[in-house]
Amino acid sequence: MSGGGDVVCTGWLRKSPPEKKLRRYAWKKRWFILRSGRMSGDPDVLEYYKNDHSKKPLRIINLNFCEQVDAGLTFNKKELQDSFVFDIKTSERTFYLVAETEEDMNKWVQSICQICGFNQAEESTDSLRNVSSAGHGPRSSPAELSSSSQHLLRERKSSAPSHSSQPTLFTFEPPVSNHMQPTLSTSAPQEYLYLHQCISRRAENARSASFSQGTRASFLMRSDTAVQKLAQGNGHCVNGISGQVHGFYSLPKPSRHNTEFRDSTYDLPRSLASHGHTKGSLTGSETDNEDVYTFKTPSNTLCREFGDLLVDNMDVPATPLSAYQIPRTFTLDKNHNAMTVATPGDSAIAPPPRPPKPSQAETPRWGSPQQRPPISENSRSVAATIPRRNTLPAMDNSRLHRASSCETYEYPQRGGESAGRSAESMSDGVGSFLPGKMIVGRSDSTNSEDNYVPMNPGSSTLLAMERAGDNSQSVYIPMSPGAHHFDSLGYPSTTLPVHRGPSRGSEIQPPPVNRNLKPDRKAKPTPLDLRNNTVIDELPFKSPITKSWSRANHTFNSSSSQYCRPISTQSITSTDSGDSEENYVPMQNPVSASPVPSGTNSPAPKKSTGSVDYLALDFQPSSPSPHRKPSTSSVTSDEKVDYVQVDKEKTQALQNTMQEWTDVRQSSEPSKGAKL
């Protein structure tokens, strides 16, 4: 055993071969000794031997150049999948070591981190010892989880209403939602507590209610007027129950609920039916006769329940005659925000109960929603509620977009009607955007576009500009943000089809473009990339339980500068093979810095004496010192580098010297031949 330093830790570890040889070489078991040189003045090293009786180490790892230590790595290699792997990253190489037990790994990691000065060693090793327990289950009890989720829910409600959709994450599981109800009722206004009391009586809808109570709490609380109007239902919580009854999961199953609940659940704008029970307006049978309860309707009801699309798609999939349901939708939105009595007469005040004549739809001012322009009052409320759509989750937006596009698909005949009569209007642009089906000239096209708008971050500001302008114009919300911007600025809508059609085509084109790129990937470089990936996969990689410790940058720089010289001498003692190459390269720094040779760099001139003498001739005409450093690199490289780096005078002088040598040799050789 080689001495030098106090022994801190010893034991058997399996060592990885170099990264480039992981596929060909085996992981061999070696005897490791960790030595600390603080007391003796020697460097801190980690040595490994062939066995515990060997006297000469196979390699000495200088820990002064240790940059990082990772514990708890994961390895895909079969024989090492369940092993305890940690690594030591140095400036030269990364050593992957495998311990037999987790305690051994923690012991080695803690010792190495203490020697290297990693302050995080103690608390990280403590956390490493608890890795198994942390991986099997959460440490907090369900009560703590519920309390924390309640706290987050309360904060998000009060401070960040724009993210109020996030509390739904805590209400997917019934146990958490049961704990949340008292907290929600205490933190929410009194009106919302009343809704909770109503929904608590519905045991069969617990799953839907558990989700929607968080969503409805978060989204309805953003509109105080909406909550107040819901609470003014004279004891009827139908509207509140409707949102909580269907949630996300009970939407396709309206048959489970009563007529009241179905009306309010599947057609919230039409839930005038629910308001009608209270205010004496629309009846449930009226909405039932319209076959409203299609599968696509619930997603739009979900948007309305979020306080966004209170006036949009709900009536579109009801029947092919969905145009005359829009007045009721807008009338409900007016009732929902202003609590006016929504009677069939009120709906007739806006557009007639039947689809408007083609002459109304030809107004190029409002574009595709030909039925909506007369409802400037109701469209005002739409514009007021639509900007909230930006706070919807992306998942909800995608659902709404899919549902609304399906709704539009059901009415191609209306697309044909409006395609002929609105060639110069915005519906032509919509028709080019969704060919053959989207030119619905009414809320069909508008609803699918409304569902797509939440994905545009700037839609809120554009909608604000629309509200400042024409109210009926704000009803139409195109899917494309560029076209929407032109519409809000009042530009002629006839120019939009040119932009909208190609833009949609460009969105469809990327798959073919990607397919065209695939043949290039199948070229010769592909196997090389796959080979590189396999090599990377064969390396241990970090997992969620991996803990890392690294040295501070300034500490490492100071240590590296302090121990810059020992690395060359260290490599001499580490291995016999390749010592001359390892020593020859770093020893050039002393040669270039000072002409005085040292004892360690003496072997270098012996091996390449001719090249050194030849370069010495190149140094003579050069007075400034900066030119010497580039020339020293030519000791191990080709002489052409010197000709590129030196100036013309140096090059000419060197050529003259070479010519003189050749002349002398040529003149001396014939004379020798003559003497012979």
From Swiss-Prot:
Gene3D superfamilies: Pleckstrin-homology domain (PH domain)/Phosphotyrosine-binding domain (PTB)
Subcellular localization: Cytoplasm; Cell membrane; Membrane raft
Compositional bias of kind Low complexity: 140-149
Residue(s) carrying Phosphoserine: 2, 133, 140-141, 148-149, 159, 164, 210, 218, 223, 264, 281, 285, 368, 405, 422, 425, 480, 543, 622-623
Pfam families: PH
Impact upon substituting S210 to A/E: Impaired interaction with 14-3-3 proteins and increased EGF-independent cell proliferation
Annotated region described as Disordered, given as residue ranges: 127-178, 341-430, 492-531, 556-643, 656-676
Entry GO terms, CC: cytoplasm; cytosol; membrane raft; plasma membrane
The keyword Calcium is annotated on this UniProt entry: no
Record PTM text: Phosphorylated on tyrosine residue(s) by the thrombopoietin receptor (TPOR), stem cell factor receptor (SCFR), and T-cell and B-cell antigen receptors, gp130, IL-2R and IL-3R. Phosphorylated upon stimulation of TNFRSF11A/RANK by TNFSF11/RANKL. Phosphorylated upon EGF stimulation. Phosphorylated on tyrosine residues by HCK upon IL6 signaling. Dephosphorylated by PTPN11.
Residues annotated with Phosphotyrosine modification: Y266, Y293, Y452, Y643
Biological processes per GO annotation: osteoclast differentiation; phosphatidylinositol 3-kinase/protein kinase B signal transduction; positive regulation of cell population proliferation; positive regulation of mast cell degranulation; signal transduction
GO terms assigned for molecular function: phosphatidylinositol-3,4,5-trisphosphate binding; phosphatidylinositol-3,4-bisphosphate binding; transmembrane receptor protein tyrosine kinase adaptor activity
Keyword terms, alphabetized: Cell membrane, Cytoplasm, Membrane, Phosphoprotein
Family per record: Belongs to the GAB family.
Domain notes: The SH3-binding motifs mediate interaction with SHC1 and GRB2.
The protein's name in its UniProt record: GRB2-associated-binding protein 2
Organism: Homo sapiens (Human)
Gene: GAB2
